[in-house]
């Protein structure tokens, strides 16, 4: 079973950017959980985050209150948080 990674995107990111992040995580062997799929529903985003094994923070995440909240909640729940560089340094190996 692959690790599920929540994609925390600041407002202003396009759907194309959101799905590019999703594709990148998939290529690394992760199962992406894309906050863009929730159409701005912050409660749905937080529910999605709590069901994940990690959080991908997009560039400039700290400028967006919801992305900052996602990082704080994840850290409180001991869910690993990192940039693309972090997750790409730890790709999922086959069979995980």
Predicted feature residues:
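Conserved catalytic or regulatory cores that recognize and/or transform ribose-phosphate-containing ligands
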Residues: 1-96
């Amino acid at each position: 079973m692959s690790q599920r990674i929540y994609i925390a995107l600041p407002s202003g990111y396009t759907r194309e950017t959101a799905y590019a992040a999703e594709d990148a995580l998939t290529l690394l062997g992760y199962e992406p959980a894309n906050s863009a799929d929730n159409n701005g529903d912050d409660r749905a985003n937080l529910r999605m985050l709590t069901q994940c094994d990690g959080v991908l923070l997009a560039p400039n995440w700290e400028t967006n209150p919801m992305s900052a909240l996602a990082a704080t909640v994840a850290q409180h729940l001991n869910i690993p948080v990192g940039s693309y560089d972090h997750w790409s340094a730890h790709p999922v190996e086959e069979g995980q």
